[in-house]
């Protein structure tokens, strides 16, 4: 498949093993047995997630407000985590962390301990990591599993914000109903084989 800047691709997977293999091919945890991946016309070959991030791929796990936020760090520090892979000496230059704080535009949020912040704000922070970093692609695992309507709407808006920044978005979902609720090309992943909608 081809994914252009700002486009969204929805992939419905029918088995957990296929989803894990797809994710791990991009994160470097699993080698590619057939075919090749190119990002911006450059062969994509990585051996770990840190290298994947440096090569322009971001990752958002299921329920990121629980799994991707470090409550012993400030909001600015959380959003800045991927940037230290991109900018040498990031943590030692105040101008960099200040620019992230300016991006967040929420001094009150940065003063609070993250354990005292609601899930909706934490969800936004998890996505804002990649808005600041601006990778070429972000792969999102089951973005709409939360049953809370407000949380789903925030997630939808944050995915749209990624697209507006020119970031390609790949959604991996086990919820077939989601396929018709968000715009974008659809593909299906079953037993390790990726097919287009008309071939399903």
Regions inferred by a protein language model and the residue ranges of each:
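Glycine-rich phosphate-binding loops of nucleotide-dependent enzymes
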Residues: 1-200
């Amino acid at each position: 498949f081809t994914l252009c800047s700002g486009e969204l691709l929805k992939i419905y997977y029918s088995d957990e093993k296929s989803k894990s293999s797809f994710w791990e091919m991009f994160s470097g945890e699993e080698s590619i047995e057939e075919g090749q991946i190119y990002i911006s016309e450059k062969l994509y070959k990585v051996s770990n997630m840190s290298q994947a991030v440096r090569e322009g791929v971001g990752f958002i796990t299921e329920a990121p407000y629980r799994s991707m936020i470090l409550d012993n760090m400030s909001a600015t520090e959380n959003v800045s985590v991927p940037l230290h892979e991109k900018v040498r000496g990031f943590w030692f230059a105040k101008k960099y962390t200040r620019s992230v704080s300016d991006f967040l535009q929420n001094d009150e949020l940065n003063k609070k301990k993250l354990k005292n912040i609601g899930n909706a704000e934490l969800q936004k922070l998890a996505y804002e990591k990649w808005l600041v970093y601006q990778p070429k692609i972000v792969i999102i695992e089951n973005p709409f599993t939360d049953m809370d309507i407000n949380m789903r709407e925030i997630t939808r808006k944050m995915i749209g914000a990624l697209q507006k920044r020119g970031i390609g978005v790949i959604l991996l979902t086990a919820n077939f109903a989601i396929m018709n609720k968000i715009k974008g090309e659809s593909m299906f992943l079953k037993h390790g084989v990726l097919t287009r909608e008309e071939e399903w």
